[in-house]
Amino acid sequence: MLILTRRVGETLMIGDEVTVTVLGVKGNQVRIGVNAPKEVSVHREEIYQRIQSEKAGNPSEGGNF
């Protein structure tokens, strides 16, 4: 795992087309902005896991969203 230190307003690059920018820090929360091409899916981890579970035929409890 690569570990980086960034300040508010600073950006990191992932490949040639994806940027991640630190927008703000408040307590233990960090706001980030992700700029990626439309064909690149960007999800929070818990949403990504739910999508993968539903694709595998295991819908999450609570059902409709």
Swiss-Prot record:
GO terms of biological process kind: mRNA catabolic process; negative regulation of translational initiation; positive regulation of translational initiation; regulation of carbohydrate metabolic process
GO cellular component: a single term: cytosol
Predominant location: cytoplasm
Keyword Nucleotide-binding: no
GO terms of molecular function: mRNA 5'-UTR binding
Keyword NADP part of the UniProt annotation: no
UniProt keyword annotations, A-Z: Activator, Cytoplasm, Repressor, RNA-binding, Translation regulation
InterPro entries tied to this protein: CsrA, CsrA_sf
Compartment(s) where it occurs, according to its Swiss-Prot or TrEMBL record: Cytoplasm
SUPFAM superfamilies (alphabetical): CsrA-like
Domain of life: Bacteria
Alphabetical list of Gene3D superfamilies matching this protein: Translational regulator CsrA (2.60.40.4380)
Self-association state and partner proteins as the record states: Homodimer; the beta-strands of each monomer intercalate to form a hydrophobic core, while the alpha-helices form wings that extend away from the core.
Task performed by this protein: A key translational regulator that binds mRNA to regulate translation initiation and/or mRNA stability. Mediates global changes in gene expression, shifting from rapid growth to stress survival by linking envelope stress, the stringent response and the catabolite repression systems. Usually binds in the 5'-UTR; binding at or near the Shine-Dalgarno sequence prevents ribosome-binding, repressing translation, binding elsewhere in the 5'-UTR can activate translation and/or stabilize the mRNA. Its function is antagonized by small RNA(s).
Family (UniProt): Belongs to the CsrA/RsmA family.
Name listed for the protein in its UniProt record: Translational regulator CsrA
